[in-house]
Swiss-Prot record:
Binding partners and assembly: Homomultimer. Makes the hexons and eleven out of twelve pentons. Interacts with triplex proteins 1/TRX1 and 2/TRX2; adjacent capsomers are linked together in groups of three by triplexes, heterotrimeric complexes composed of one molecule of TRX1 and two molecules of TRX2. Interacts with scaffold protein; this interaction allows efficient MCP transport to the host nucleus. Interacts with capsid vertex component 2/CVC2. Interacts with the small capsomere-interacting protein/SCP.
Gene: MCP
A Pfam cross-reference name: Herpes_MCP
Subcellular location: Virion; Host nucleus
Listed name of the protein: Major capsid protein
Keyword annotations: Capsid protein, Host nucleus, T=16 icosahedral capsid protein, Virion
């Protein structure tokens, strides 16, 4: 058949029966197109292509709206055909709206009618689809490759059928695309219900009048997000009326359209439909099952659309109905048939414009929500099923959760309503009184999971924990004033004896301390006082493991005795031990509670021991002669054995007089008494006390081993020394009697860079000194090592008398046991040996005959304590006054002391670098300075009435540490003025040549703990011992692995993603939707022809307010596992390594072993280090938990409500209008937290600029681990993210709250969904800068009654606590 000479005619389909237009037009059109392909016979492919393009364009253009008009979504729009849409550059539409008026009485101005002119942009869009025809198929369809066989004819039919299927698929894509495009258009202009509904309440005359109202609005928004999100999931079971109320609010919070259209949708009874509710199939089904009543199952819908007319240049006026084709019967007759003989029919069509538009009845679900009749539509299956396009109403919601781990409640909250509710094992202490170390919660499947301190190893057991170099650089740029240098400056002692040095120090103390030091004031503060906005020193509390302080700049420590007048700067020193954390942030109650936990099932001192030792430490009449004996023995085992008889008589006499034990202030004496006098020489009860005391010291030593994981030495030190400072040889005991600790200290190696100054010069040891060699006025660096028991040869090398364990036990005794008994009422004293030895030689001993037996009673004239022998200023007087019964044989032994004498009390200043567990390129230059007395004594309770002490005859105060610096003992140094004595009551009078508080290993918080503690001695010894555990990464790895509370808590942050099912409501005729002429572009390709179909579209809103709104109605499923996967910085963070390679390797191995985020295989040379892939996944994508170090005393109630994980509110939404206000809200801690005005923060280690948490998670510092990909904390710590979200929130309120004011025709108002409003239903945590509390508890028993209102549902039981769910998920998981 030859068609070259015939005019091309588009085939006319069969007439469609009336009343079945929408259901049959597709079938008819498809048949027409198929018949056309079947009838084509031509060798001219060009003619075929032209004919096909025209047919295809007309075909698709005609049928695009067929399926769309069957959808309830068509209620919301006015569809208008606009063939010239492709030529529109800048389309705008003008509306005129008359504002309503209210006539009022009284003295009110008379209102005039107000007209508002509003102009809106036309937003241009397009739809595109494509398909291809292979060259072989073209040949078959065109007949060029037909060979006349039946096979070729069959192939041609199959080619035509395949082409028809392709075209049908393209048409189907346009039909689906129209619905998808309009749905997205409606979503673009629909603000969330949680925003739109509150604005109707808090809008004053159309706008938010003040920042107070805006603050109230923000508070309401927060509440509505929690309550309204997932309202269907929460209330569909028990409180269906709340679901109906939320739906009614959704359909009533929008503004009606300005369009008065002739096209109306109605039910079968003729009642107009007010709008459409679009949701998912699941939500639709749940709403129809007992929540909403189905009013009708069919609807009458119009089947016409308008036509655009061009009037003017670039200004398009939309005729809401326009000149319209009457119905789709006319479309089938006239648009698919364009013959000239049908023009007459078109003219008739125009004349019939005034006729009532035709409608078609389609199946629909019509429900009544309140008083509004709406379509209930679900497009999920009808439009989106089997496509690769996600359903827009299935969204993602990211929620960030916060879980407090290890918080210690204040005493008023550590109660139990019924102590018997959770009963421990009979006979055992209640573990619920211990500080919590684990928190339990449920994952997405309702399984109970936990996080403990060990989970945080990947965060703090990392070298970034020690990276403070950038912090120092930053804070040194700020101005600082040096109010008081005492405690922040160290010097060497001046020339002269220690007594002269002490006097010179007290004479010039006021120059170093013109004001009260910060470190003493902080030790007496409460947590509220420390964190108050008025605390100017809060800005230096930046890190849990470092002290930042103002000190003299450009002075090498130790500096000159008189501090030079230099500029101040900020210095940093490692706190070394958790006991040095300031008391307000690690309070005494917590330390004692931890000590009680450690004392359970371990050695405890007998009550008799406690009474006897406590009595000795508090005895104001303790015999002064005992201190004299200590001095002449001066730790010498040889001398002790020589004077054993005298010592026995002293101990026995004091025991009989007071039932207390002597010499408990001297560790060497206790050791010798246990070794030599414990076999019946003393009363059994007395011996048991010394033995019990030593066993307690050894038990404290074993405590360190129990909380240390065994391993190979690192940096030349064992792990117990890296874990507890008392086992570190770098720290000397406060009192030494020989050179043993110094010799053991020298074995540490050069890496510790230890230095030692003895009396200000280098150290040198001498074996011993006899009477002929003694020089009491000696100065310099010589220290007497004491005479050994055997091997007496001064030419032999000087070796220790005892093993290193002796020094360890000595430090444990002095730093843990002595403070527990003395409670700060003791002081290290210097000894005036130039007076002590002459006094010892003044003893009066009566002569006895060779056959006479020494008398035992002082009433005997031959007894040395008989009144006739009590000569003034003799040793006899001291024994007599102390009621110590000694005999002649015992006193004769005193002549042995001259064979091994002490010359002086010598000040020793020792310094050391950090150990291998804390040494990095930043910390290696930080040195500790600790003072020690060689040949000094520890004086217990001060004896106010002893004249020899008051005059400083034999002893004078020489405090080496705040633990041994009782101010009353300064009375033994005559001549001190009242100002010094008064200052010593507030500030420990430790000379700066014995170190300074910030440079000492043991600092003021430990001393104040001993003073303020109300715990018994057993608990306090363990509590003090726990305070000496170190704060380095390696030490923390041991403590976490063994269940030791490190003295700080954590804020756990986790972000989870949930799939949501949203509900969209749109007013009827609220959107004008324009469709241009479809264009077909043909592109020749290798092997065939590609066809690309493009149809321009446009839309414009027809409202003077928001005509659509949506809400997250139901929770579909959690995407993440809501689990307990801890962050591992070794996988995400690069930072300075540990200086010791073994230490760095040890940390990596310990942290990564068993860690689910451990690196996969060896570290690659190129590329990124990736985590190991698990063999299986059961609960979904693992959500990462990050840890923010938090003070253990943080307010637990802060975590019971939505809060900022930093510990302080952030975001411009809280700020005023100043440019710097938003930054000040986030970082200016001189102002209170907007949410908690009485305090600046709840966590100074994270909320302040350059704090540890800020440096760890703030993306501003360009750390590769601080990113939104790896870190859920990123959005809370990064200022740009906070400001961006805050600006979104501010602009959101301003945009949505703006009223339509009288305006000119040039005003353009687009009621679009404000930028950032989607965060209300997608990421509210970043918008509000708050994370939500998750149902969690430190005790699984509390989780068994978690629901509010349930009988017995307690939030706490002693030290344990329960945090209730205050998130939008509350009520969504009834099984949890």
């Amino acid at each position: 058949m030859d068609r070259r000479s015939e005019a091309f005619k588009i085939p006319v389909p069969e007439v469609i029966p009336a009343g079945q237009i929408l259901s049959t037009i597709e079938v008819s059109s498809h048949r027409t197109l198929f018949d056309f392909f079947k009838q084509i016979r031509s060798d001219d492919n060009g003619l075929y292509a032209a004919q096909f393009d025209v047919l295809l364009g007309t075909y698709c253009n005609t049928l695009t709206l067929v399926r769309f008009l069957e959808l309830g979504l068509s209620v919301s729009c006015v569809c208008t055909k606009f063939p010239e849409l492709n030529y529109v550059n800048d389309g705008t539409i003008q509306f005129e709206v008359q504002q309503p008026m209210i006539a009022r009485d009284g003295p009110h101005p008379v209102d005039q009618p107000t007209h508002t002119y509003m102009m809106k942009h036309i937003e241009q869009r397009s739809l595109s689809a494509a398909f291809a025809i292979a060259a072989e198929a073209l040949g078959l369809i065109g007949g060029t490759t037909l060979d006349g066989t039946q096979i070729s004819s069959s192939l041609r039919v199959r080619a035509i059928q395949q082409l028809a299927r392709n075209v049908q698929t393209v048409l189907d894509s346009f039909e689906r695309g129209t619905a998808d495009q309009l749905l997205r258009v409606l979503l673009e202009k629909a603000p969330p219900l949680t925003l739109l509904a509150p604005l109707q309440i808090y809008r004053d005359e159309g706008r938010l009048a003040s920042r107070v109202n805006r603050a109230v609005l923000v508070s309401e928004l927060k509440r509505r997000v929690i309550e309204d999100t997932f309202f269907l999931t929460k209330h569909e079971r028990n409180r269906k009326e709340l679901v109906v109320a939320r739906l009614a609010e959704l359909v009533n919070c929008t503004a009606p359209s300005v369009a008065v259209t002739r096209m109306t949708h109605s039910d079968t009874k003729g009642r107009p439909v007010d709008g459409v509710v679009v949701t998912t199939a699941g939500v639709r089904q749940r709403l129809l099952q007992g929540i909403l009543t189905l009013e009708d199952m069919a609807a009458d819908v119009p089947v016409t659309y308008g036509e655009m007319m061009i009037t003017g240049t670039n200004l398009v006026t939309a005729l809401v109905m326009g000149k319209a084709v009457r119905n789709l019967d006319d479309v089938a007759h006239h648009l698919l048939g364009m013959q000239r003989d049908q023009v007459r029919a078109n003219e008739k069509l125009i004349k019939d414009y005034e006729d009532v538009p035709s409608t078609a009845r389609v199946r629909a679900d019509l429900v009544l929500v309140g008083d509004r009749l709406v379509f209930l539509e679900a497009l999920e299956k009808r439009v989106y099923q089997a496509t690769n396009v996600p359903y827009p109403l299935v969204g993602n919601l990211d929620l960030t959760f916060i879980i407090p781990l290890g918080i210690f409640k204040p005493a008023t909250d550590r109660y139990s309503r019924h102590a018997g509710s959770f009963t421990p094992t009979p006979g055992q202490p209640d573990p619920r009184t211990y500080p919590p170390q684990t928190v339990y919660f449920f994952n997405k499947d309702g399984n109970l999971v936990q996080l403990s301190f060990d989970s945080a190893a990947g965060t703090v057991c990392h070298s970034s924990f020690l990276d403070v170099d950038s912090v120092l650089v930053a804070i040194r740029r700020e101005p600082h004033e040096l109010h008081c240098a005492f405690g922040a400056y160290v010097t060497l002692p001046p020339a002269g004896t220690l007594l002269d040095q002490m006097r010179r120090f007290f004479e010039r103390w006021h120059m170093l301390m013109p004001a009260r030091p910060r470190w003493t004031a902080e030790a007496l503060m409460t947590i509220d006082q420390l964190l108050s906005p008025g605390n100017a020193n809060l800005r230096l509390e930046l890190h849990p493991a470092f002290d930042f302080f103002v000190a003299p700049a450009d002075v090498v420590i130790p500096g000159p005795f008189d501090m030079p007048n230099v500029m101040p700067t900020v210095m940093a020193m490692p706190r070394l031990i958790n006991g040095n954390i300031p008391l307000p942030l690690c309070p005494v109650e917590f330390r004692d509670s931890r000590g009680f936990e450690l004392s359970v099932d371990r050695h405890r001192l007998n009550p008799a021991t406690v009474l006897a030792v406590r009595g000795a430490f508090r005895d104001a009449n303790y015999p002064m002669v005992f201190y004299i004996l200590e001095a002449v023995i001066h730790g010498s085992e040889r001398t002790f054995c020589a004077l054993a008889r005298l010592i026995i008589q002293c101990i026995v006499s004091y025991w009989r007089n007071t039932h207390q034990v002597a010499f408990v202030n001297n560790f060497y004496m206790i050791m010798y008494i246990n070794a030599y006098l414990g076999n019946g020489e003393l009363p059994e009860e007395c011996t048991a006390i010394y033995r019990d005391l030593l066993e307690h010291v050894q038990a404290l030593r074993r405590l360190v081993a129990e909380y240390t994981v065994p391993g190979e030495a690192v940096g030349g030190q064992g792990h117990d020394a890296l874990n507890n400072v008392l086992l570190d040889p770098a720290l000397l005991p406060p009192l030494i009697w020989d050179c043993d600790p110094i010799l053991h200290r020298a074995d540490m190696g050069r890496a510790r860079a230890q230095e030692l100054w003895v009396d200000g010069v280098d150290y040198a040891a001498i074996p011993w000194v006899e009477m002929a060699e003694v020089n009491f006025g000696n100065t310099g660096g010589h220290l007497v090592h004491n005479r050994p028991i055997r091997g007496e040869n001064k030419r032999n090398p000087i070796v220790p008398h005892h093993d290193p364990e002796w020094s360890v036990l000595s430090k444990i005794y002095y730093y843990a046991v002595v403070p527990a008994f003395s409670r700060g009422n003791c002081c290290t004293m210097g000894v005036r040996y130039d007076r002590v030895y002459p006094l010892v030689q003044t003893v009066v001993i009566p002569d006895l005959g060779a056959e006479e037996i020494a008398p035992t009673s002082p009433s005997d004239p031959r007894h040395p304590l008989n009144p006739r022998h009590l000569v003034p200023n003799t040793l006899n007087i001291l024994f007599h006054n102390a009621r110590v019964a000694v005999d002649t044989d015992a006193l004769l032994l005193l002549q042995e002391v001259v064979t091994n004498m002490a010359e002086r009390t010598t000040p020793v200043l020792a310094t050391a670098a950090p150990d291998a567990g804390t040494a990095t390129a930043v910390t290696q230059e930080m040195r500790t300075f600790d003072g020690t007395l060689h040949h000094g004594i520890l004086m217990m309770a001060y004896q106010r009435n002893d004249e020899t002490l008051l005059e400083g005859t034999f002893f004078y105060p020489a405090p080496v540490n705040a633990l041994f610096a009782c101010p009353e003992h300064l009375g033994a140094l005559p001549g001190l003025n009242a100002e010094v004595l008064e200052a010593a009551r507030d500030v420990p009078p430790v000379p700066h040549f014995f170190g300074g508080n910030y440079y000492a290993t043991v600092r003021q918080p430990v001393a104040q703990h001993a003073v303020q503690s109300r715990a018994d001695e057993n608990t306090l010894t363990y509590a003090l011992m726990a305070g000496y555990f170190k704060l380095g990464p390696i030490a923390l790895s041991h403590q976490f692995a063994t269940g030791f509370h490190p003295g700080f808590a954590f804020t756990v942050v986790r972000q989870d993603r949930f799939l949501t099912e949203n509900i969209l409501f749109a007013e009827k005729a609220s959107e004008s939707y324009f469709m241009g002429q479809l264009q077909v572009n043909r592109h020749e390709a290798v092997g065939g022809v590609n066809f690309v179909l493009t149809q321009p579209r446009a839309n414009v809103d027809l409202g003077v307010g928001f005509t659509a709104a949506y809400a997250a109605a139901a929770l579909r499923t959690p995407v993440t596992d809501m689990g307990n996967l801890p962050q591992n910085l070794y996988l995400t963070r690069g930072t300075i390594p540990m200086l010791d390679g073994d230490a760095d390797a040890y940390l990596r191995r310990v942290v990564n072993t068993g860690n689910r985020l451990g690196p996969q295989g060896p570290r690659p040379i190129f590329g990124q280090l990736m985590p190991a892939t698990p063999a299986g996944v059961a609960h979904g994508q693992a959500a990462v938990c990050e840890f923010i170090v938090t003070p253990v005393s943080a307010d637990l109630n802060y975590f019971r409500r939505p809060c900022n994980p930093r510990g302080r509110s952030a975001g411009p939404v809280y700020a005023c209008d100043g440019e710097a206000d938003a930054v000040d809200v986030m970082y200016d801690h001189t102002q209170g937290d907007p949410a908690y005005p009485s305090r600046a923060t709840v966590n100074p280690w994270a909320s302040q600029r350059n704090s540890y948490g800020d440096r760890l998670y703030n993306g501003k510092y360009n750390l590769n681990g601080a990113s939104p990909v790896y870190s859920p904390c990123f959005k809370f710590f990064t200022p740009t993210e906070v400001e961006a979200k805050g600006r979104n929130m501010t602009q959101l309120i301003a945009d949505v709250g703006a009223s339509v004011a009288p305006s000119t025709s040039n005003t353009e108002i687009q009621f679009k969904r404000p930028h950032g409003s989607t965060d209300l239903v997608e990421d509210p945590c970043s918008l509000f800068q708050e994370a939500y509390p998750l149902l969690s508890s430190t005790d699984t028993a509390l989780l068994r009654t978690p629901h509010i209102g349930e009988i017995g549902a307690d939030e706490g039981h002693f030290a344990q606590y329960l945090i209730r769910d205050e998130s939008p998920l509350k009520g969504c998981f009834p099984r949890i």
